[in-house]
């Protein structure tokens, strides 16, 4: 006998009950005020349920409790915390307050709406590669997310050592599409170190987060940039059959680059869904389309074969790259398919 399918409301209640049971089982140390030292500044370098690792200004990391009013605390948050005079059950302090964020990286969740996964990000490094496949569509999806979140992007094309001269010219011409839009593009190889000094310079004095599909070499790049020996960002062997790497990072964590700057490695960036956006937001996410918004003959213009479409006219004049225009419509189509498949609508929020 087949199981009865749960409704969306039932699924949310099951998930909420599960989270409540998990929280009840967590070891929670209760501090008396007399057991705590003076308040000081720190940064969250990782979050685990009701605990967080806080790096103090002297670089020492402390495992801390989190005040119940700070449930949305994420890696990268600047906080005020108080150390305990002695460690209690492995906990050495408590996070008391969080400073306002200048940016927050979020992702959509079918049950909980928009969830923060990292804070105070200065740039999103979009890593792509010629293998397993160079996908401009994936790059454009990440760019839409960056524009929507108002976080500066940096496009990094990895594994360029695998290109011959002719292929490199072709790929370089594709990257000119983004350079023409004033997006920064770096072509690198973690194997030969080509372009790595330029990448290090772009990462200095900033908090970055790396985004990209499995197999493009994110972990290999990060391990090289971080010069990690014992403590490495995990990466599995690439499958001989699929050519896709297996992502094994499970919790967001902030690392310091030896050349300056920081990176937050987070599994959440693999799940940059756009299905929660409105079509108008996607249009604005393509920066070259913004100037034509509101100029079409009809207000409900779909920017396809509609008469009087300002975007199509710009495409005909060569003011918009065909590749970007095609990806724009692919993204809108995929969003509509996901919403239909998941039964998502504004009333579900």
Curated annotation (Swiss-Prot):
One Gene Ontology MF term: GTPase activity
InterPro entries for this protein: G_CP_dom, NA-bd_OB-fold, P-loop_NTPase, Ribosome_biogen_GTPase_RsgA, RsgA_GTPase_dom
Binding site for Zn(2+): 296, 301, 303, 309
PROSITE patterns, sorted: ENGC_GTPASE (PS50936), G_CP (PS51721)
Coiled coil: none
Protein name as it appears in the record: Small ribosomal subunit biogenesis GTPase RsgA
Quaternary context: Monomer. Associates with 30S ribosomal subunit, binds 16S rRNA.
GO BP of this protein: ribosomal small subunit biogenesis
Functional summary from the UniProt entry: One of several proteins that assist in the late maturation steps of the functional core of the 30S ribosomal subunit. Helps release RbfA from mature subunits. May play a role in the assembly of ribosomal proteins into the subunit. Circularly permuted GTPase that catalyzes slow GTP hydrolysis, GTPase activity is stimulated by the 30S ribosomal subunit.
Keyword Cytoplasm included in the entry's annotation: yes
Domain CP-type G stretches: 102-272
UniProt-listed Enzyme Commission number(s): 3.6.1.-
Annotated GO CC locations: cytoplasm
Cofactor(s) demanded: Zn(2+)
Binding-site list for GTP: 158-161, 212-220
Main location: cytoplasm
Residue spans of biased composition, Basic residues class: 1-11
One Pfam match: RsgA_GTPase
Source organism of this protein record: Pectobacterium carotovorum subsp. carotovorum (strain PC1)
């Amino acid at each position: 006998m087949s199981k009865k399918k749960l409704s969306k409301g039932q699924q949310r209640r099951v998930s909420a009950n599960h989270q409540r049971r998990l929280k009840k089982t967590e070891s929670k140390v209760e501090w008396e005020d007399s057991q705590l030292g003076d308040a000081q500044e720190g940064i969250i370098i990782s979050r685990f349920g009701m605990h967080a690792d806080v790096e103090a200004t002297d670089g020492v990391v402390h495992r801390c409790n989190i005040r119940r009013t700070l449930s949305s605390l994420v890696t990268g948050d600047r906080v005020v915390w108080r150390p305990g005079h002695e460690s209690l059950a492995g906990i050495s302090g408590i996070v008391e307050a969080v400073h306002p964020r200048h940016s927050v990286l979020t992702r959509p969740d079918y049950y909980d709406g928009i969830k923060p996964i990292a804070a105070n990000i200065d740039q999103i490094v979009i890593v792509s590669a010629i293998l397993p496949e160079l996908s401009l569509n994936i790059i454009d999806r990440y760019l839409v997310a960056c524009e929507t979140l108002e976080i500066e992007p940096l496009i990094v094309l990895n594994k360029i050592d695998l290109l011959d001269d002719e292929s490199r010219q072709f790929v370089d011409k594709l990257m000119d599409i983004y350079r023409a839009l004033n997006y920064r593009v770096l072509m690198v190889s973690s194997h030969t170190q080509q372009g790595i000094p330029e990448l290090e310079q772009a990462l200095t004095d900033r908090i970055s987060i790396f985004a990209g599909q499995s197999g493009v070499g994110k972990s290999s790049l990060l391990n090289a940039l971080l010069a990690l020996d014992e403590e490495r960002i995990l990466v599995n062997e690439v499958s001989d059959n699929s050519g896709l790497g297996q992502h094994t990072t499970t919790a967001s964590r902030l690392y310091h680059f030896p050349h300056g700057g920081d990176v937050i490695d987070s599994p959440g960036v693999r799940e940059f869904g756009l299905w929660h956006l409105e079509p108008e937001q996607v249009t604005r996410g393509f920066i070259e389309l913004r100037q034509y918004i509101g100029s079409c003959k009809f207000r409900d213009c779909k920017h396809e074969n509609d008469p009087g479409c300002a975007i199509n006219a710009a495409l005909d004049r060569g003011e918009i790259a065909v590749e970007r225009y095609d990806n724009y419509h692919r993204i809108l189509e995929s969003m509509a398919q996901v919403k239909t498949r998941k039964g998502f609508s504004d009333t579900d929020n």
